[in-house]
Amino acid sequence: MIRVLNAKFLVSAPDISLAPPANSSEVAFLGRSNVGKSSLINTLVNQKSLAKSSSTPGKTRLINFFEVEYARGIKNAQGELSEERANLTFVDLPGFGYAKVAKSMHAQWRKNLDEYLKFRANIKLFVHLIDSRQFDMQIDKDVNDYLQSFLRPDQKILNFLTKSDKLNQSQKSAVLKVYPGAHFVSALKKTGVEKANELIYLNALGL
């Protein structure tokens, strides 16, 4: 079993130069504005307001870093249980899409994000959040293609389909035809959260 023991806010950075020291593997959460990144991070770590969300989609332009301590139960050959612990850094990125900011500011914002995603050496996992109710949007496909364009051998991408409590089984099947292997999760109903933490832990640490 994999569980979160503790989580705390580290820093908000406008660009990679002000990011915290690279002390652990980083998990970058990204997706469209209003896809539910902050809500999902709070649900994953079982805290109500660790990650702050904006009432105006696209307004948040800072890269927010959080330290998350995980514990994993391991059984040895003799059947004895032990526990390993590891820290990951969750990174809540600004939403892609319709930010109501000046064009010059928007261009700088995109440049900062691009530099962080491409050149931050300790990013090991990209968690691409996709609204399961609006799964066939071009911007989500563009984000996926963008990540694939510079993905290193030591990095992975997970597609998490948010707000999945709104879908019935046939609708979920339709979504999986577009994103095979994606994981459904609901911050509201807390469904798929345990599996999501397991996927994050194992993939970020290359296990």
Regions found by a protein language model. Name each.
Residues V4-L18, K163-L207:
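Canonical P-loop GTPase G-domain recognition
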Residues R110-G181:
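Conserved C-terminal guanine-recognition region of P-loop GTPase G domains, centered on the G4
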Residues N23-S24, L44, K103-H106, K141-D145, ...:
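Short, glycine/charged-enriched secondary-structure capping and boundary segments
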Residues T60-F65, N76-L88, P94-I123, R133-Y146:
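Switch II of P-loop NTPase G domains
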Residues V27, R32-V35, I41, K48, ...:
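Structured catalytic cores of enzymes that bind and process phosphorylated ligands/cofactors
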Residues S49, A99-A102, Q138, Q169-K172, ...:
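Active-site-proximal flexible loops/turns
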Residues M1-Y98:
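Conserved G1/Walker A P-loop phosphate-binding module
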Residues P57-K59, A71, G95-G97, R133-D136, ...:
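Conserved nucleotide-binding/hydrolysis micro-motifs of P-loop NTPases
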